[in-house]
Regions:
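Positively charged n-region of N-terminal signal peptides that target proteins for export
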Residues: 1-9
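Small beta-barrel nucleic-acid-binding modules, primarily SNase/OB-fold domains
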Residues: 2, 20-278
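Bacterial N-terminal signal peptides
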Residues: 9-18
Length: 278
């Protein structure tokens, strides 16, 4: 009997812990909230425990550290600290694939994304579908670019496109998951760009040409290594497939360089696995 009592106590205790640990994905999304923590410029946690991915802006990453990441986080902290924020959701659902709320953040009549764009602490980043009038966001970004504020003073943001992420190592065996290799490329210019004739080159000089695809300002395209049907409707996540039967990118170290149709370098990004210090 003494062995049963702890078990009867333990089961509801474990259930309580499991419920507490589960992501709050089924509750209705809050319209207003207090922010309990800021991870980086575009990611924060609400007092409810919900994590929020900010709409309309992509800020430099804290890990691995990117230039102006700390300044972006500090700007977001100062904007939301001690204040009730309003959350603006889009037409495509309230949560992303990571379970985070996807929302704009307002304090009174001030939009956090515009606040960051104006200071050059991020670039326009549209998560489709999104029917927002982007004019004020583009204007804020262009004022920061013209003044060379923040990221616009760095070499990484001098082209029309910016590689925001580089997944050179697919999950599992790359040979069986070729499309698990991909880059995400954002149009950081104020105008739509036709990518026909652009190409991407790996560290060994192998070249892959982009198909015709119009990339609106602030939108991203996922560039997969393998075969598939191109997704060219900007109301959804844009995607192109380079058509390779085998993995393109080296898991240990590689470099992706994008050239425009005239052979000018638009952007480049390196992937490398850092060795642990003994």
């Amino acid at each position: 009997m003494t062995t049963e009592r702890p078990m009867r106590f333990l089961l509801p205790f474990v259930a309580t812990i499991a419920l507490a640990a589960a992501p709050p994905s089924t509750a209705p999304p809050p319209a207003t909230a207090m922010v309990s923590a800021v991870y980086d410029g575009d990611t924060m946690t609400l007092a409810s425990g919900d994590r929020v991915r900010l709409r309309w802006v992509n800020t430099p990453e804290i890990r691995p550290p990117e230039t102006y990441a700390v300044q972006a986080r500090e700007a977001t902290e100062a904007f939301v600290s001690g204040k009730t924020v309003s959350l603006l959701y889009g037409p495509g659902g309230n949560r992303d694939g990571y379970g985070r709320l996807v929302a704009g953040v307002m304090v009174d009549d001030d939009n956090l994304s515009i606040h960051l764009l104006e200071r050059g602490l991020g670039h326009l980043f549209v998560i489709p579908p999104d029917d927002t009038d982007l004019t004020p966001f583009v204007q804020a970004q262009e004022r920061a670019r013209a003044a060379k504020r923040g990221i616009w003073s760095t070499p990484e943001f001098q082209g029309l496109l910016h590689i925001t992420s580089f997944h050179a190592n697919a999950d599992g065996d790359d040979r069986e998951n070729v499309n698990g290799e991909y880059l995400r490329v954002c149009n950081v210019s104020p105008d739509a760009i036709d990518l026909a004739g652009f190409r991407i080159v790996d560290i060994s000089g192998n070249s892959y040409e982009f198909p015709k695809l119009v990339l609106p300002t602030g939108h991203t395209v996922k560039v997969h290594s393998g075969k598939g049907a191109h997704q060219v409707d900007p109301r959804e996540q844009l995607a192109i497939y380079l058509g390779s039967a085998d993995p393109i990118w080296n898991n240990k170290e590689d470099r992706a360089t994008i050239y425009d149709r005239f052979g000018k370098v638009v952007d480049a990004r390196t992937h490398s696995v850092q060795k642990e210090t003994p």
